[in-house]
Amino acid sequence: MRIMGLDVGSKTVGVAISDPLGFTAQGLEIIKIDEESGNFGFDRLAELVKEYKVDKFVVGLPKNMNNTSGPRVEASQAYGDKITELFNLPVEYQDERLTTVQAERMLVEQADISRGKRKKVIDKLAAQLILQNYLDRMF
């Protein structure tokens, strides 16, 4: 069973995929989106779903530290609703609090990547962490 993890932002969607057995997550890519113009990257997402034979999505929920929901949670849920409609696949949500902070820390401390390069990979790594946290919780 292949599961795709998504870190949905206002300008990009970080994408990760599980291995076929569902044990590990691998960052795939970052899809540029534009909420204002209505471009949500669904064409590219469709290509990835077909290529990896995805069975389920896991979308990160950016809850506030006090466990309340803000506008980005609503945007992530709306994105999840739309991909359910488009792909007819189940969507589950994973708390993503601090995953971007964790991803940035990993890139600085372990990979010593410059700030400019971090921006290019951070959403992909955040998606990988979201998916890996989900997989760890499920198995």
From Swiss-Prot:
Keyword terms of this UniProt record: Cytoplasm, Hydrolase, Nuclease, Ribosome biogenesis
Gene Ontology BP terms: rRNA 5'-end processing
Location in the cell: Cytoplasm
Main localization of the protein described in the UniProt heading: cytoplasm
EC number: 3.1.-.-
GO cellular component: cytosol
Enzyme class: hydrolase
Function statement: Could be a nuclease involved in processing of the 5'-end of pre-16S rRNA.
Family: Belongs to the YqgF nuclease family.
NCBIfam families: RNAse_H_YqgF
Protein name, entry field: Putative pre-16S rRNA nuclease
Organism expressing this protein natively: Streptococcus agalactiae serotype V (strain ATCC BAA-611 / 2603 V/R)
